[in-house]
Amino acid sequence: MYGMLYESVQHYIQQEYGMETWRKVCQIVDCKHQSFKTHQIYPDKLMPDFAAALSASTGESFDFCMNFFGRCFVRFFSNFGYDKMIRSTGRYFCDFLQSIDNIHVQMRFTYPKMKSPSMQLTNMDDDGAVILYRSGRTGMSKYLIGQMTEVAKEFYGLDMTAYVLESQNDICGGTAGPIKLTEGPLTVIVKYRLDFDNRDYMAKRVNVIAHPSQLKMPSVDLNVFLELFPFTIVLDHDMKITLAGEKIVETWILHNPGVNPKTFIGSHILERFKCRRPKDTQIQWETILQMRTVLFEFELIRTGHNRAAYDAALNFDFENFDEASSLNEAQAMALASAKEFSAENAKEEAAAAATSKDEIDPATGQRRHSVGLRSILLKGQMFYIKDVDSLIFLCSPLIENLDELHGIGLYLNDLNPHGLSRELVMAGWQHCSKLEIMFEKEEQRSDELEKSLELADSWKRQGDELLYSMIPRPIAERMRKSEEHVCQSFEEVSVIFIEVMNIYDSGSNNIQDAMQAVTTLNKVFSALDEEIISPFVYKVETVGMVYMAVSGAPDVNPLHAEHACDLALRVMKKVKAHALPGVAIRVGINSGPVVAGVVGMKVPRYCLFGDTVNTASRMESSSDPWMIQLSNYTALKVQKVGYKVEARGFVKVKGKGEMETYWLLEGPE
């Protein structure tokens, strides 16, 4: 959702409930935004989250809060001058209800990423009306009631109450569209009953119907009608094209060279046109009947963009095509006039594509610089004609200037004789729809760029995680800065060695035994990895059956001995809990000075050097199963802070002679 919706929530919560309540709401929601930007997109889930938080803070119901947010938005958008747009839709509230979708269409030029719902007025009487709401979001039905109530009160002076008659796929408190695994996202459909004083509007309708100007006129022949509206399309209940005006057929043939013209009549409208407005509309009979007051915009689907289709057009046998069997005389004449233009246009496009320095899209064969520049848009309204039980799309093409008119193979006398179509083309007006297409193309490229950047960031994070598994983060950051000296001496650290025992019989040549040993070792080492808590303890390496860790490096830690002992105690407890048959571990810990640095080029490793490391290794190798052996210095250090140790006595250590060692029994209380 755009930030303007959340701006209204923030403003009126602060105004009516106080700044402290707003802070509490943000704290409950864990909202990091101190303020909202009008044209920035924010997560949809914030709206129900704010409503739930306000409900918890004030004691009001969730539905009341969503209704309150809807009323707040209507009051708030008047600051942007949008109240004038609402007031200009008509004298009556029903006029506004019929214009909601058209308002959303216009608002998309300012808010291009707006995912607006669709609303149609389905029934009216003296006591109110019924509207049908469709949306890809759930949980917003009470929000809409708040909006409708406030619009009726502020702009039309009506006291309105609303309630839900029917509801499909709506989920209270949600915002993402419901999903069916076999079909994908579902549409939320809610039918509302709006109760208000609608007598004035109904009386006006009766007066209009009874006016002498509305007396029944003689029938008009359909051919005459198609001459008056040469871009008309007639649709049956299956939304298939049953009839079409002369110019729309001619235009389709010109821009679909190589396609059998017989296929136009009888085809589904979405096979020949793409619905651009209203967006995400289901092109079905019942749906379109309810949207007769809504402005529609269709884009002609052309094979002319495809270079292969243009090449095929050069060899298309127009002479042997039997057009008279499916097209009327005017349409057949249009086909005849298209013969020369189709081949000529195909040659021009192919030559331009061959000589152009612009990139050709390998998927579509389109020249990237021309995408969207010559799209043919038809803008108009759907009407139901009872006499023929059909829908008629009365439309006219949106053409920017004379250059574009010639580019799509039309002339001024081809345009509708009524209206200002010809005058606008002569004046060179820039239609907003053309700008919108260009904007959508750029937005699509922007989205692709964002996805590429996100993918690059993901790869970078994976690379960082791999690097940090071999080298500590502080050291890696220093290496990135091209620091030559990454070696560091530490006055005192605690080194831990953990060996897994009885895991593999070295005399066995059985592959299954070896695989079992690897699986068991992986379980133990994975359990040890889970107990490593950075930055208190750092895993150095694993060699064979031995696991090495250190506390106090690379991050200096004055409590290194305590953290090393804590790790050893946790590891003992966790490995015992796994109850691996015959498997045991032994641990050795020693404290003292070390030197640390990165060694290697292809597979760099963070290594520790010094007598402290050797002594810690001897503490482990001379320890007993399920025991933790400490050097004398480490034992005295942790004993002072409450760790329970037991003297083992003097142990003969390779290269050291006899050393006094201790068993670590448990940590402090």
UniProtKB/Swiss-Prot annotation:
Ranges in coiled-coil conformation: 430-458
Example of a GO biological process term: response to oxygen levels
Classification via CDD domains: CHD (cd07302)
Cofactor binding note from Swiss-Prot or TrEMBL: Binds 1 or 2 heme groups per heterodimer.
Principal subcellular localisation of the protein: cytoplasm
Regulation: Probably not activated by nitric oxide (NO). Heterodimer exhibits some stimulation, compounds (SIN-1 and two of the NONOates) that were ineffective at stimulating Gyc-88E homodimer did stimulate the heterodimer.
Expression tissues: Expressed in embryos in a segmental pattern in the ventral nerve cord (VNC) and in the brain, beginning at stage 13 and continuing through to stage 17. Colocalized with Gyc-89Db in several peripheral neurons that innervate trachea, basiconical sensilla and the sensory cones in the posterior segments of the embryo. Expression in wandering 3rd instar larvae is most prominent in a small cluster of cells located in the anterior medial region of each brain lobe. In the VNC, expression is found in scattered cells both laterally and at the midline.
Chemical reaction(s) catalysed: GTP = 3',5'-cyclic GMP + diphosphate
Any one GO molecular function term: GTP binding
A GO CC term attached to the entry: guanylate cyclase complex, soluble
Subunit structure as annotated in this protein's UniProt entry: Heterodimer; with Gyc88E, in the presence of magnesium or manganese.
Stated role: Heterodimers with Gyc88E are activated in response to changing oxygen concentrations, alerting flies to hypoxic environments. Under normal oxygen concentrations, oxygen binds to the heme group and results in low levels of guanylyl cyclase activity. When exposed to reduced oxygen concentrations, the oxygen dissociates from the heme group resulting in activation of the enzyme.
UniProt name for this protein: Soluble guanylate cyclase 89Db
Species of the source: Drosophila melanogaster (Fruit fly)
